[in-house]
């Protein structure tokens, strides 16, 4: 079994990837989507989203990073994919699942699930453009308005050359509302010969067990569940081995938060950093009651020095 950290725009950036992969249990992670259209993007654009390329395409914990592209122009995607490989991408992932309205209006993400033929063209052209030893993978939802074309889309991706398909078991219209329709993952696996990875609504070890029972998927991808419970992958890995599951305590999480905050101060402006910390705290409230107290304490705080003191960070250089 492999457990992947999902790509989430504006949330799972290199700072949070570094924090979460250090906890353990995550086998690979993916960049936020890198939007490409009409032209070959410069190297610094890729490094912005994948700073791990400077570290052999791995986080400091040694977790491999995949690079995800988003767009609808097969030629442009293929050219940028080839360049990304030159920069160090070990795996190329294609985004056909983003539900954001602004992205869909620009013919990116889940809107392309209405066009299985285009999915096939994109994957096949990217596959031809990158070295044979670099896998091309894809992430999809079950459809746009409904699941009518789910199987056709999966076939198109596999036939185009996708080596693996991550299935977020909801439609675009479903957004992130529960439930995730895990039974569809099993149906998709029946019609394609490549591995299918289950994604959606895995917040606990028990969710993982139910997902596995329903869809039979060997591998899983977790997004918000891992952000809300940073040791979830480690818990699942332990459960899968029959070992005792010992959840991370709030006290054990504190050093992570402090390190994360210090990294935000280094990589972001003093205006951006407080919002980034609060964004993570909001999701942590789903697993830790103490996070609610901390969030309420910091909610209106914008002074970074004050936040540093409230977090108990050392002010020494």
Swiss-Prot record:
Reported cofactor(s): FMN
Residues forming the catalytic site: 98
Keyword Aminoacyl-tRNA synthetase carried by entry: no
Cited InterPro entries: Aldolase_TIM (IPR013785), DUS-like_FMN-bd (IPR035587), DUS_fam (IPR001269), DusC (IPR032886), DusC_C (IPR042270), tRNA_hU_synthase_CS (IPR018517)
Claim: ATP-binding is one of the keywords in the record: no
A Pfam family this chain is assigned to: Dus
Enzyme class: oxidoreductase
Binding-site residues, FMN: 7-9, 68, 139, 199-201, 223-224
CDD domains linked to this entry: DUS_like_FMN
Gene Ontology MF terms in the entry: flavin adenine dinucleotide binding; FMN binding; tRNA binding; tRNA-dihydrouridine16 synthase activity
Enzyme Commission (EC) number: 1.3.1.-
Site note Interacts with tRNA, residues: 35, 95, 176, 276, 278, 299
Alphabetized UniProt keyword annotations: Flavoprotein, FMN, NADP, Oxidoreductase, RNA-binding, tRNA processing, tRNA-binding
Catalytic activity entry: 5,6-dihydrouridine(16) in tRNA + NADP(+) = uridine(16) in tRNA + NADPH + H(+); 5,6-dihydrouridine(16) in tRNA + NAD(+) = uridine(16) in tRNA + NADH + H(+)
Family per record: Belongs to the Dus family. DusC subfamily.
Main function: Catalyzes the synthesis of 5,6-dihydrouridine (D), a modified base found in the D-loop of most tRNAs, via the reduction of the C5-C6 double bond in target uridines. Specifically modifies U16 in tRNAs.
HAMAP family reported for this sequence: DusC_subfam
Record protein name field: tRNA-dihydrouridine(16) synthase
Organism of origin: Pseudomonas syringae pv. tomato (strain ATCC BAA-871 / DC3000)
